């Protein structure tokens, strides 16, 4: 079947837009208009049926990666940096990203998989941007990209965990992830809009995502389990082979600290709590009130911090419910909670 069911679009790539901002101070990146003009003028057909190899990124691949995004998605991606070759060169050099490419003997880039720093921890990266040129989707390239990505994780990245998201409007990516021993730990209901090629009225429906984790090196530590979810979380830890010390929760102290990430294209807002304070209920309530138009709100809570039970009660009181466990998300475990504007369409979720 079409590789379109495999590919993860850059819908969530607003999460890595910070790279563009950081790198502009290092090297003058071209504007979106400059890059698109260059790509328009250099469009050509890549000969199908060429032999290819799967390799780690080389600076000579940068232009080909930008061209691949353009060939597959045109000018629809809202993240400017995906069209800029210099972005890939600098981000790989700075170890903020790590690309794996499918490269033909003539040097054309016909496939891509990439690590990028989305989770807050130092020892975890997200694996995504799984893309293959349409004329190469009937080959082994898609699977070979995954095999290389998960079987040859560079030591210099220092990763304890590889995190990936699998769509729930089909089972293919979930099965591939399971084959490589990544474990599903959370579900983000309706976290993405319907696919661009769905009916104009969005009849395909919003897409839920499974958060899966390949734990390469577990880091045992103490966690506080909110009583309402304790049985579920204890079962998840046991079934996924994660060693934790369960300690009694305590009252929160001080003031709450958090950061908010907003993804307009997905109508999603996420608050990650760095410190659970005595004002956590007001903190969560304000977060919801300040983005009332979002289809989905998410709150990510630190399971190692005193007061997480208070935070869970506060979130539940305004409509949040369990999304799941995020192992070593900030180099320690965090809890995902979510709130949807409307009742989810569970008939669209394939597991």
Where are these regions (language model features)?
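Conserved active-site tyrosine of GNAT-family acetyltransferases
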Residues: 1, 175-177, 315
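Conserved acetyl-CoA-binding loop-helix of GNAT-fold acetyltransferases
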Residues: 1, 132, 138-153, 162-164, ...
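Conserved catalytic-core motifs of GNAT/GCN5-like acyltransferases
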Residues: 3-18, 41, 163-165, 178-201, ...
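Conserved GNAT acetyl-CoA-binding A-motif
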Residues: 3-6, 153-167, 294-302
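C-terminal "cap" of GNAT-fold acetyltransferases
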Residues: 10-30, 192-226, 331-351
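Conserved N-terminal entry element of GNAT/NAT acetyltransferase domains
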Residues: 15-60
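A conserved beta-strand-loop-helix scaffold within acyl/acetyltransferase catalytic domains
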Residues: 49, 56-134, 260-265, 277, ...
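Non-catalytic interaction/regulatory modules that flank or connect domains
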Residues: 230-328
């Amino acid at each position: 079947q079409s590789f379109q069911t495999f590919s993860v679009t850059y819908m969530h790539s607003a999460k890595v837009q910070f790279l563009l901002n950081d790198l502009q101070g290092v090297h003058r990146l071209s504007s979106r208009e400059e890059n698109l003009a260059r790509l328009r003028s250099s469009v050509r057909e890549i000969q199908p049926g060429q032999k290819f190899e799967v390799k780690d990124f080389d600076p000579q691949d940068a232009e080909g990666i930008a061209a691949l995004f353009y060939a597959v998605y045109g000018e629809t991606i809202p993240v400017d940096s995906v069209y800029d070759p210099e972005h890939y060169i600098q981000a790989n050099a700075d170890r903020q990203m790590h690309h794996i490419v499918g490269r033909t003997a003539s040097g054309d880039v016909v496939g891509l998989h990439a690590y990028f720093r989305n989770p807050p921890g130092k020892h975890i990266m997200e694996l995504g941007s799984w893309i293959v040129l349409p004329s190469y989707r009937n080959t082994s390239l898609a699977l070979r990209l995954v095999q290389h990505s998960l079987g040859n994780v560079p030591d210099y990245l220092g990763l304890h965990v590889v995190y990936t998201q699998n769509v729930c409007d089909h089972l293919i990516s979930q099965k591939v992830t399971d084959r490589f021993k990544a474990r599903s730990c959370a579900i983000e209901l309706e976290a993405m809009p319907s696919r661009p090629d769905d009916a104009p009225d969005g009849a395909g429906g919003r897409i839920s995502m499974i958060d899966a984790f390949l734990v390469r090196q577990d880091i045992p530590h103490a966690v506080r389990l909110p009583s309402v979810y304790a049985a579920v979380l204890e079962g998840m830890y046991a079934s996924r082979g994660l060693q934790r010390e369960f300690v009694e929760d305590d009252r929160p102290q001080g003031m709450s600290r958090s950061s908010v990430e907003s993804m307009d294209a997905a109508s999603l807002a996420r608050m990650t709590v760095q410190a659970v304070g005595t004002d956590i209920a007001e903190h969560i309530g304000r977060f919801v009130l300040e983005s009332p138009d979002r289809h989905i709100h998410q709150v990510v809570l630190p399971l190692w911090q005193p007061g997480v039970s208070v935070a869970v009660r506060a979130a539940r009181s305004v409509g949040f419910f369990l999304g799941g466990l995020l192992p070593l998300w900030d180099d320690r475990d965090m809890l995902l909670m979510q709130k949807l504007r409307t009742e989810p369409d569970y008939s669209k979720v394939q597991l």
